[in-house]
Structures are given as structure tokens and as C-alpha cells.
Amino acid sequence: MPSLKEIRNRITSVKKTQKTTSAMKMVSAAKLNRAEDTIRRARPYSVKLRAVVSSLSGKLTPDDNPLFRDQAGKRVAVILMTSDRGLCGGFNANLCKMLARTLHEEGIDSAEMHIVGRKGRDFFRRTNHQIVADYPDARPEHYLDIVFTVLDGLTKRFAAEELDKVYLVFNEYKSILTQEPTIQPLLPIRPLEDAKEEGEQEILFEPYIEELIGPLVQQYIQNQMYTAWLGTLAGEHAARMTAMDSATKNAGEMIKQLNLYYNRSRQAAITKELIEIISGAESL
């Protein structure tokens, strides 16, 4: 049975942990608000660009641009987006496990991995998949450079038929409580039915559609990766905020139980001392 001092030390330790988790929750909430604001500001451009590319894809054949060409084969490259830090529940583990399971089901034993974030890198180091490039500690101010670096190499290799498919894997941010693991085909570019609905009217291209293909396609692919990163960032903060909120509540419950146990132990110790005093007095 632990002593009263040990119980007091345990209560003090749990209270310190509770303060830490509460502070982390507030920090994550503030970061989530900023991330959501960035997503809201980026969405109009993303929606319009998707509508333009969807309209464009309906007017092109694979011969017009190699990035629209569907290629049979299992030479697959994956761009995986995870976080650098933990303490965010199953945010990273669920995504990595889903990707590993999907690759196994598709019979892809050695995909080419381009990984943003430490957690994804640490997970796939234990597999047979080849980590071609990883970007730990990816700060927001450096992220566009990473986007351009990754996509420039992959689009050139896809156009040269060195790759058959490129997938973008990330946690799509739905709400504070929901971050959905997503595997999104990035290359080849396919018609986007949802973008057609969002775009509403048909888009006219002037003067020549051929002059717009290259720049628009590059902007679209870059925007897809950037949008996925924004969702991953918001999802990470939401998952960490939820996890820290749960940890703070659990710490509060533990403190209540420890206080109750402490009071009972203290009462039992006092009762025992009184009995000993009374017994000693009676013996005299």
C-alpha cells in the first residue's frame, strides 16, 4: 500500500501533466483556427482551378499532353504527407497503415516513396518500399519549395514514361473530429466530375487552348499538393487538440480518484493512531 507521501507526489505529478496537456490543447486550437482560415482563403482559387482543368480535360486527348495519358503498369510513386510530431491520436498511424494495406492489396511490393513528415518516414523505413526522398521538419515558409521540387521531378518522369502512376496520400480535413485518410490519384490527370458541378458554366479558352495546357496543368498539380498539405496541417492540429482535451479530462478524473484514495488512506491512518492511543491508555 503506498504511503501518503507517495500519493501526494502522484497527485502533484498528474496535476503538472494536466497543465501541460491543457496548454497543448490551447496552442493546437489557436493553430487550428489559423489553418482553417488559410483553407477558407485558398478554397475559391482551388475550386475555380479544378473547374478550369476539368473543362480542359474534356477537350484534350492524351496526345495533347502526356500528363493525361493513362499508363498500365505498377511503377508507382507515392507522395505521403504526415506530421513531424506525435501526441495526435491515430492521425499518422491510421494513414500509414491504410496506405501499406492498399499497396499490398494492389500487389505493389516496392513503391517509390516521397514522404513529408517524420512519422511517415519512420513507419515506412520498416517496409520494403523505397524511400526516395523525405522532408522532415517541413516548415510552412519552405513548403512551396518542397512542392516544386517533388512535383518537378515526378511530372518529368511520368511524361517520360518512367512512372505509371503517382498518388497523393494525406488526411483530408473534414471537421475537428474527422480527418479522413485519403489516397488521391495525381497522375495521370483524369476528368473531375465534382469540379464540373462546382464550376457550373462551361469555360472558354482564348486565344489558343494549346498555349494554356502546360501552365494550367502545372498549377493544378501544385495546387492539389498544396491543398492536401493545408488539410494535413489542419487535421494534425485538430487531432492533437482532441487528444489533449481527452488527456486533460482523464487527468482530472485521475486526480479526483487519487484525492479520494488519499483522504481514505489519511482517515484510516488517523483512525489507526487513535485506536493505538486508546489501547495504550486502557493498558495503563
Residue ranges and their predicted role:
Residues 1-284:
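C-terminal beta-strand-loop-alpha-helix "lid" module of Rossmann-like NAD(P)-dependent dehydrogenases
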